């Protein structure tokens, strides 16, 4: 569960990073220093890698199969309840928007 979440989070951040990199900004009078940007990017990357490694170590150290099973069960029950309530809410909104006929 944790590894998949971290992988998904990394992929989302990677896509967002490419979107930010790919955005074309209009020319400015004074372009930003590429050295500063690369240092900031390297610094953020190293912080991210160390935080990811620390989170992975903490997860592996505190992993309990019983707790993991309870969390999976809680997640499945809560998502089932939320989908039910979302359906009810959607039905109510549609009936209000549609009006009485």
Curated annotation (Swiss-Prot):
Gene Ontology CC terms: chylomicron; intermediate-density lipoprotein particle; low-density lipoprotein particle; spherical high-density lipoprotein particle; very-low-density lipoprotein particle
Keywords: Chylomicron, Glycoprotein, HDL, LDL, Lipid degradation, Lipid metabolism, Lipid transport, Secreted, Sialic acid, Signal, Transport, VLDL
Signal peptide: 1-22
An annotated GO BP: phospholipid efflux
GO molecular function: lipase inhibitor activity; lipid binding; lipoprotein lipase activator activity; phospholipase activator activity; phospholipase binding
UniProt-listed Gene3D superfamilies: Apolipoprotein C-II
Compartmental location: Secreted
Region spans: Lipoprotein lipase cofactor: 78-101
UniProt-listed InterPro entries: Apo-CII, ApoC-II_dom_sf
Start and end residues of each stretch annotated as Lipid binding: 66-74
Changes after translation: Proapolipoprotein C-II is synthesized as a sialic acid containing glycoprotein which is subsequently desialylated prior to its proteolytic processing. Proapolipoprotein C-II, the major form found in plasma undergoes proteolytic cleavage of its N-terminal hexapeptide to generate apolipoprotein C-II, which occurs as the minor form in plasma.
Chief place of localization: secreted
Record has Signal as a keyword: yes
PANTHER family: APOLIPOPROTEIN C-II (PTHR16566:SF0)
Function according to Swiss-Prot or TrEMBL: Component of chylomicrons, very low-density lipoproteins (VLDL), low-density lipoproteins (LDL), and high-density lipoproteins (HDL) in plasma. Plays an important role in lipoprotein metabolism as an activator of lipoprotein lipase. Both proapolipoprotein C-II and apolipoprotein C-II can activate lipoprotein lipase.
Family according to the record: Belongs to the apolipoprotein C2 family.
Protein name (database record): Apolipoprotein C-II
Native source species: Macaca fascicularis (Crab-eating macaque)
Lineage, opening ranks: Eukaryota, Metazoa, Chordata, Craniata, Vertebrata
Gene designation per UniProt: APOC2
């Amino acid at each position: 569960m944790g590894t998949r979440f971290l992988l998904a989070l990394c992929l989302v951040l990677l896509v967002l990073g490419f979107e930010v990199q790919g955005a074309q900004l209009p020319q400015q009078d004074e372009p930003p220093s590429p050295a500063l940007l690369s240092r900031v990017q390297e610094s953020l990357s190293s912080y991210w890698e160390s935080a990811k490694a620390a989170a992975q170590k903490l997860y592996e150290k505190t992993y309990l199969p019983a707790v993991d099973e309870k969390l999976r069960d809680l997640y499945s029950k809560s998502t089932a309840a939320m989908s039910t309530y979302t359906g009810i809410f959607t039905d109510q909104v549609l009936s209000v928007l549609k009006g009485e006929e």
